[in-house]
């Protein structure tokens, strides 16, 4: 998802600056980097392939709600796979997060 997030950040050039944080490991999670980025930008869009419900993105959002809520200028947005069984390859592109969905989430967050 990192290359996709980087493409979305490029699409936003001229509208806003974006910082893409690559969470390379789940254990140990670099919580300091996550919190520093939230404090620096004031806005967070989490992108993950997994379905929205019970995904790791929800855990990241919970950490931000507990530890960075006063640094945020809006809600944490998540761009995820849909809450449906993972589809066959023929419709996978409709299921997966896209550059357009990520950029749209960032634009909506900027308007918050």
Predicted stretch roles:
Residues 1-112:
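Thiamine diphosphate
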């Amino acid at each position: 998802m990192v290359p996709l997030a980087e493409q979305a950040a490029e699409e936003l050039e001229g509208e806003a600056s974006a910082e893409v944080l690559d969470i390379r490991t789940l254990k140990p999670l670099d919580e300091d980097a996550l919190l520093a980025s939230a404090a620096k930008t004031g806005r967070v869009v989490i992108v993950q392939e997994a379905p929205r419900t019970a995904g790791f993105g929800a855990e990241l959002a919970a950490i931000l709600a507990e530890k960075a809520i006063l640094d945020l200028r809006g809600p944490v947005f998540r761009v995820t796979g849909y809450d449906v069984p993972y589809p066959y390859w023929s419709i996978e592109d409709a299921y997966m997060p896209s550059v357009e969905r990520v950029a749209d989430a960032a634009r909506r967050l900027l308007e918050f």
